[in-house]
Amino acid sequence: MAAPYKSDRRGLIWICIFLGSLCDIRAEQIRYSVPEELERGSVVGNLAADLGLEPGKLAERGVRIVSRGKTQLFALNPRSGSLVTAGRVDREGLCDRSPKCTANLEILLEDKVRILAIEVEIIDVNDNAPSFGAQQREIKVAESENPGTRFPLPEAFDLDIGVNALQGYQLSSNDHFSLDVQSGPDGIKYPELVLENALDREEEAVHHLVLTAFDGGDPVRSGTATIQVTLVDTNDNAPVFTQPEYHISVKENLPVGTRLLTIKATDPDEGVNGEVTYSFRNVREKISQLFQLNSLTGDITVLGELDYEDSGFYDVDVEAHDGPGLRARSKVLVTVLDVNDNAPEVTVTSLTSSIQEASSPGTVIALFNVHDSDSGENGLVTCSIPDNLPFRLEKTYGNYHRLLIHRTLDREEVSDYNITITATDQGTPPLSTETYISLQVVDINDNPPTFTHASYSAYIPENNPRGASILSITAQDPDSGENAQVIYSLSEDTIQGAPMSSYVSINSNTGVLYALRSFDYEQFQDLKLLVTARDSGTPPLSSNVSLSLSVLDQNDNTPEILYPTIPTDGSTGVELTPRSADPGYLVTKVVAVDKDSGQNAWLSYRLLKASEPGLFSVGLHTGEVRTARALLDRDALKQSLVVTVQDHGQPPLSATVTLTIAVSDNIPDILADLVNINAPIDQEDSDITLYLVVAVAAVSCVFLAFVIVLLIHRLRRWHSTRLLQAAGNGLSSLPASHFVGVDGVHAFLQTYSHEVSLTADSGKSHLIFPQPNYADTLISQESCGKSDPLLVSQDLLEIKGDSSLQQAPPNTDWRFSQAQRPGTSGSQNGDETGTWPNNQFDTEMLQAMILASASEAADGSSTLGGGAGTMGLSARYGPQFTLQHVPDYRQNVYIPGSNATLTNAAGKRDGKAPAGGNGNKKKSGKKEKK
């Protein structure tokens, strides 16, 4: 029981609200009255005063008249605030003969989106005089008619109403006829001619009368028609209609030519007096345009289109007359039935074409009116919009509807809407009209730029050109206009103390990252950048993304040979190998590194050239130089090898080193043999030199030939003189040469002199090795006294006569153990015995002696040399040298492809003296001290 009671209370509440809204609507209607036929601009009423507004505020408040496409009868005067006539107001044209004529219009207050209804009653004035359809009318009357017979007269029409309408008729005075006016049920007055006295055709065949119609206006208006009464022979029967009134209902829009009905009248007379014809009687022009009457058959057909919206009812007067002229009257009442032939009309009265996406729900977008000219259910209209749109419709006053925002708009999802408003009536079949409203959603900056990737990785090869494009970074902003204009920038970081902006830059508009300098992989391998994308909205929004820039290594570094180090003076090192070495004996090891990485740092070693092919081999990956076969007696003492070190880059880079290997089992043999070794001549260099000499000679001989011919005689004499001077002066001193160490390694340096004794007829030379002068001596004078020369000539031995100058055979200290030899052989047992020196100082002394002898044999242009940190010797000599231990190249040397470093096998030297080295312990100690 409680539920129905609660439901009834809700119903009562809604009924009260509805009745209250009706009261409000009625309270907002304004009524005016105005007479018709006023001049244009005539004041109808003070609208501003009735609205409670100042006259000048109508335009500001957006007050205007809205209509549904009909002719505007009224207008607003924005200055006075009055409602005035916009043109001629014709009551008869608007309302025909309706007793009350009103014009309805709506006033729109745009600032409040409110509709105000105004009803203007148009008061009739006497502006139309009564008129007859025909100015003349002939009535045929039988002369035998009895007094009292009535004859219908033509009716007059007056478009005015009320007092101004037709009030009565008057007939001109005569002796035979009088006027009687009858009033029908519809209030229309019908004049009739009444025969008062008998007629005599032979006395007067035609009677002329004047019928006057007048209205009740002030002043009175009237109209006249001439009535001609023609007397005929007797026709005592008039036609008679089968029905006093004919009723028919037809649907509008019947096809033209459709027969509506057939009227029928009969006349009992015979002959011409009984022949009946039909015609319309006193019809308006509009009816004559819609209907057609067949005068012989009485068929009424549709002549024009029937439109219920123009008129739903037609009253047509018809008459039938026989041959002599007797007439009968009847009515045809045509009711036009409405069909759903008019689609609803939608008139947009207020529209917002653009709206911000942040607008709140309930915001009014448009106000429109819906009208259907049909009636009944055919005129009931419902409006709808698609369900998927964020809008809704709301009905307001009368047939007005509002389009509102229902959900929050998002321009990034939909930037514009083409809203279809469908107005559908309830007819059968229903008709509909679609109206389109375009709405542009205005963007606000509510979206930050979004990068296409969560992070970026870019790669650039080193040695890139400055300004090279690295990567294009793209960020999308779904907003529009300035809100979508993205500006790119880099974070202000530093790299190795330098600002990031000195390394890379980014195009603020395109997001293309450029390199501002050439990168070096060996300097750094990667950069971490932070890219910011900022839009141009207010306030601006931004996003960041990380960028990892990796520098790719290129093969831009040539392999660097650590051992043997290439001397700066052009000499080559000397490696010592016993002639009794077995195949596979480790002679030395070429050690190289490459600053590049990866494949660019993979090194391979190859034997490029050898003075004795097949004698030595080089490890492809280790660089170890080993004997490929046993050494033979015919193998030369001095072997020259050219080893190339090549990386695996593209293109590959390489470096070469020249090794000189001295092959002997005994030190004296080395000294004796090196004296007679001539430096090999590089055939390729010789060929190049020959080509250069030939080219220079070919160019110069043309210019110098004549000079040479003139001077050849003097040159011969000068040459003879020089020979004589040389014979007289004795031995000439030659420039000193010196042994130097390279790459920061101080090797011992020995200075000596070459003296050549030449006479004009001598065929031999004497090599003299006088006592060397030391700046940093191997054995200082303070500690060891004066040393004997390594080699002396026979003449010098005779002069000095000192047996101490004779060379003693080497003792057992002059043995190299396998641990003291260059290369990785230090891993072998250091106690190996033999004829090689077994301490560092003896090795150095031996190398000095070997190199001195080799230099003399090469005529002062040695091809043997010692690189810094090697066991080799240099053939360049100077006045001073610094004595240090020859560094062991195996210490802290990186071998590509290996995790091992070369060990120092000379540790025994630091711990204790090797066996058999007693004669040299003091010297070694001196050297360490220095």
From Swiss-Prot:
Cellular component aspect of the GO annotation: membrane; plasma membrane
Span of domain Cadherin: 28-132, 133-241, 242-346, 347-451, 452-561, 569-682
UniProt xrefs under SUPFAM superfamilies: Cadherin-like
Places the protein is found: Cell membrane
Predominant subcellular localization, coarse grouping: membrane
InterPro entries linked to this entry: Cadherin-like_dom, Cadherin-like_sf, Cadherin_C, Cadherin_CBD, Cadherin_CS, Cadherin_N, Protocadherin/Cadherin-CA
Membrane topology of this protein: Single-pass type I membrane protein
Name of the protein in its database record: Protocadherin gamma-A4
Source organism phylogeny: Eukaryota, Metazoa, Chordata, Craniata, Vertebrata
